[in-house]
From Swiss-Prot:
Residues 25-36 have a biased composition (Basic and acidic residues). One of its GO terms (molecular function) is dGTPase activity. It comes from Caulobacter vibrioides (strain NA1000 / CB15N). Residues 70-210 form the HD domain. Keywords: Hydrolase. This is Deoxyguanosinetriphosphate triphosphohydrolase-like protein.
Length: 394
């Protein structure tokens, strides 16, 4: 007998697309898609989303084709978010949409790129990839004749900027000025938690990057399976895989361990979230926002294990000499280009040069920052070569 289709009833605190707070600019509704599904499709069709395929997480593209890029990471986050939202009875389209958007504002070369742009923009308003993501979807993407940005629903925008929790403590930072300005016109409730769907997207990001960094670290030879045996969470899982499947080679052993670790983290989030929902008595999406704590979360034991896993990854991967060397090269590339473009804006491409005109120095710096932040790793390397290596003239 065939199994019945998997079905979880809609949770009372799930977002209801038919009750969306709408879009900043009024549009006719789609006859074939919910508002949240429409947001998802708009994000997928952006140039910023396409460029994620050549923006890297830790390893620069020329180091190999087997490592994650921002695009593959984003797709993994979206898959986990959609599955987790479905299992919790939440709106899967909204969770997936926020997951797909969450990294759109990342510059080339991962966190090294963000660190360098923050330094270069320190006197001009700063740089924050979350704010840049918000600006991408509300300002920098211009694909429609009647408005700038993507005109996403209120719920998606709220999730983009608040998926990690309330942000009022950040509003004093110069880099968050754009958020404060937008909030004055289109209130996003920056002092409250976001929807359960947005919180799912945030946890899906944690699940995806912790697991794929273990995977990429082993693949790159930065650490071995034996090194992982004493690390919380992954160590016991590896031991179980080796005991149960001694026939597996090292590659399949570590892949099976990563698969089980994803499952363990998903199960933990589900159990903790359902416990918190029952304990708090939430009955609506607004009840979720009114809580003084996250609804979607890891258990305290899992959170502790993940903190120790991240500590291991920080020491053995993120600060490995090979990664440090790449970070140094990446920061030099972006820093030198930023200084040149700010000093000589006439060498910017025509469209960007036009944007830089009739602005003060801070305004020109923001245009330069936007141009660089939108680059892929490969394009940044090539642009730097053209600008600074005279051998290209030969």
């Amino acid at each position: 007998m065939s199994q019945a289709p998997y079905f979880v009833p809609r949770a009372p605190y799930a977002e209801d697309p038919s009750k969306s707070k709408g879009r900043r600019f009024k549009e006719d509704e789609s006859r074939t898609r919910t508002p949240f599904a429409r947001d998802r499709d708009r994000i997928i069709h952006t140039s910023a989303f396409r460029r994620l395929k050549e923006k890297t997480q830790v390893f620069v593209a020329h180091e190999g084709d087997n490592f994650r890029t921002r695009l593959t990471h984003t797709l993994e986050v979206a898959q986990v978010a959609r599955s987790l939202a479905t299992a919790l009875g939440l709106d899967a389209d909204l969770a997936e949409t926020i997951a797909l958007a969450h990294d759109l504002g990342h510059p080339p070369f991962g966190h090294a790129g963000e660190d360098e742009l923050e330094i270069q923009m320190r006197e001009y308003g700063g740089f924050d990839h979350n704010v840049q993501t918000f600006r991408v979807v509300t300002e920098l993407e211009h694909r429609y004749p009647d408005f700038i940005g993507l005109n996403l629903t209120w719920e998606t925008l709220e999730g983009v900027i608040k998926h990690n929790g309330p942000v009022t403590n950040k509003l004093g930072k110069p880099s968050w000025k754009a958020i404060s300005k937008y909030d004055n016109e289109y209130e996003l409730g920056l002092g409250t938690w976001a929807s359960a769907e947005a919180q799912v997207a945030a946890l899906a990001d944690d699940i995806a990057y912790n697991n794929h960094d273990v995977d990429d670290g082993v693949t790159a030879g930065l650490f071995t399976l034996d090194d992982l045996m004493d690390v919380p969470l992954i160590g016991p899982i590896l031991a179980a895989v080796k005991s149960e499947r001694p026939d597996l080679d090292a590659r399949l052993t570590h892949l099976e361990a990563v698969r089980r670790m994803i499952g363990a983290m998903v199960d933990d989030v589900m159990g903790e979230t359902l416990h918190r929902a029952a304990a708090s008595g939430v009955q609506s999406a607004d009840d979720v926002r009114a809580l003084d704590h996250a609804l979607v979360a890891f258990s305290s034991d899992m959170a502790e294990d993940l903190a120790r896993l991240r500590g291991f990854l920080y020491e053995r991967m993120y600060r490995h000499w090979r990664v440090n060397r790449t970070r140094s090269q990446a920061r030099r590339i972006l820093g030198e280009m930023f200084a040149l473009f700010l000093r000589e804006p006439e060498v910017l491409p025509t469209v960007w040069f036009a944007k830089s005109q009739n602005r003060d120095e801070a305004g020109r710096a923001r245009v330069v920052c936007d141009y660089i932040a939108g680059m892929t790793d490969r394009f940044a390397i090539e642009e730097h070569r053209k600008l600074f290596h005279l051998d290209v003239w030969n």
